[in-house]
Amino acid sequence: MQRSREVLGIAVIVGVGLLFALGNTLANLAYAGGSDPVSLSTARFLFPAIALAAILALAGKPPTLPRRDAVVALALGIVTAVYTLALLSAIEILPVALAVLIFFLFPILTSVILAVVGWERLPLTTIAAGVLAFAGLALALGVNRQALSVVGVIYGGIAALGLAIVSAVSSRIIRSGDPRPVTLYILAMASAVAIVIVLFRGEYLLPHTVSGWWGFGGSVLFSGIAM
């Protein structure tokens, strides 16, 4: 039984990673069709938030959280808005594979954060994996030097650190409870931040090509399922 749960957990993690990667890869199609990171990130927050609210309502699950947890979840929503916008901007600037490679340093960063704040130990295997991951990234950056943008790399680093923070802190809020209300609070705040940015700049860029719409819709769908 325990073995089955472990296998299921690994399968879920792999599946979520693949969905995120697919959603982020499709972002380039949306950009080529006329959209941009701000517009895409707004949709990637808003539609999953609406869908999750509907799911909770149909399930009869109150979406409320204790006050302290709610405040933390809303703060994580701001972090989520920042890291998602940074990731989608990195994908716009860098080759997709390189941007995603930088972003997927977040599991190592999550372990480091958990160890630094004293919530978990940092095992030697994680340290070794971190060294190998950063070595691989350094090699990739060296190989792709001609296509390298310092700004894009910084965006990718911000995205990885942001998701690491959200992963580390949200795990303490969720504990062994239902993660959906926490996720809803995070998505709701991220949606609000994105909408404010859209209103401030005064435009929302939708794709104007068929392939752009496929990329836009696919990115929203797959990233939403992953969340």
Feature map (PLM): residue ranges:
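Specific transmembrane alpha-helical segments of multi-pass solute transporters/efflux pumps
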Residues: 19-24, 53-99, 103, 109, ...
